[in-house]
Design a protein with these regions (language model features):
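Glycine-rich, proline-tolerant flexible connector loops at the mouths of alpha/beta enzymes
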Residues: 32-54, 106-113
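Boundary/entry segment of secreted carbohydrate-active catalytic domains
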Residues: 1-13
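Short, well-ordered coil/turn segments that N-cap beta-strands
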Residues: 1-3, 26-28, 59-64, 97-100, ...
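Acidic/histidine-rich catalytic cores of soluble enzymes
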Residues: 30, 36, 66, 132-231
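Short, acidic/polar
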Residues: 11-22, 82-91, 188-199
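Active-site acidic/histidine proton-transfer and metal-coordination neighborhood
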Residues: 16-17, 52, 57-60, 75-175
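Conserved, mostly hydrophobic/aromatic
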Residues: 22, 30, 83, 94, ...
Length: 274
């Protein structure tokens, strides 16, 4: 199993200390958000020297996803152009850091979250047209772009994500699968179908899986326990990975590093049972 964690979930300061702790915990991959792991970095602060320094401090810890979580659905054209430039800067980092992909979600359409607004064709086309120049620039730089679906955002289903990938029409467009991103209190019975659909439609584009979990408490509200302590069907995920020959990093999200080893022990036990 290719094990990883988000850098900002590691209780250390500085990329070197974070990478050393990741290795100490038995992992080899990081999801790196530079703003959250490199002290003092702000958008616009790219330099080749900084990128090379980060690469050296990571050592043999590999970057699964370089996070650039912009909002391609921003209301104004000016805001969207600003988001594009932020992402392009991360692509310049990626040319040196060599992650599997630079990743983003897609935001919600309009001033407040609304399923009705998110599911309009106008919302979809805004995301598509914002991502086109990003994908083209990434292709020039030899970098992959990965898109992550979220139930409350414009790209909110595996089928919609497949449409976006096909419409962008480039081989460097990939997908991140975070099963819990699709969970709502009223759709937990559909999660197995969402897992199966994701692998059926996107197995050829998946670059990373986010590991967390969900459960419903006695009051009927969603809670988020550590991986394999809730209701998410990890057995089905591993069965699909085997079926479709998907061998990609599994990245803990929102799990402190001191609980990483126990989390992966549980996942390994499930995987070994299939």
């Amino acid at each position: 199993m290719k094990k990883g964690i988000r850098g900002h979930d590691v209780r250390e300061v500085g990329v070197k200390a974070i990478s050393e702790k990741i290795k100490e915990r038995g992992m080899g991959y990081i999801q790196l958000v530079i703003e959250r792991s490199v002290a003092g970095f702000k958008p616009g602060g790219f330099s080749e020297e900084l990128a090379e320094s980060i690469k050296a401090e990571l050592g043999d810890v590999k970057i699964a996803i370089l996070g650039s979580y912009i909002n391609p659905s921003a209301e104004s054209e000016e805001a969207r152009l600003g988001e594009i430039e932020k992402f392009k800067e991360k692509i310049r980092f990626a040319r040196i850091l060599e992650p599997l992909a630079v990743g983003t979600e897609t935001g919600f359409f309009g001033p407040t979250q609304s399923d009705e607004a998110n599911n309009t064709e106008e919302a979809y086309l805004r995301v598509l047209n914002t991502l086109r120049p990003i994908v083209a620039y990434a292709k020039e730089m030899g970098v992959n772009v990965a898109i992550e679906g979220v139930s409350i955002f414009v790209i909110n289903s595996p089928r919609k994500l497949r449409r976006l990938i096909d419409d962008l029409g480039e081989d460097n467009v990939k997908a991140i699968f975070d099963p819990v991103n699709y969970v709502r209190a009223n759709n937990t019975d559909k999660m197995d179908a969402i897992i199966n659909e994701t692998f059926e439609l996107l197995s050829d584009r998946l670059v990373a899986i986010h590991a967390k979990d969900f459960a419903i408490n006695p009051e009927g509200k969603l809670i988020y326990p550590d991986p394999a302590l809730g209701e998410l069907n990890y057995k089905l995920i591993f069965e699909n990975m085997k079926k479709y020959s998907v061998d990609i990093p599994i990245i803990l999200e929102g799990i402190p590093d001191d609980r990483a080893e126990a989390s992966f022990d549980r996942l390994e036990n499930i995987k070994s049972s299939i």
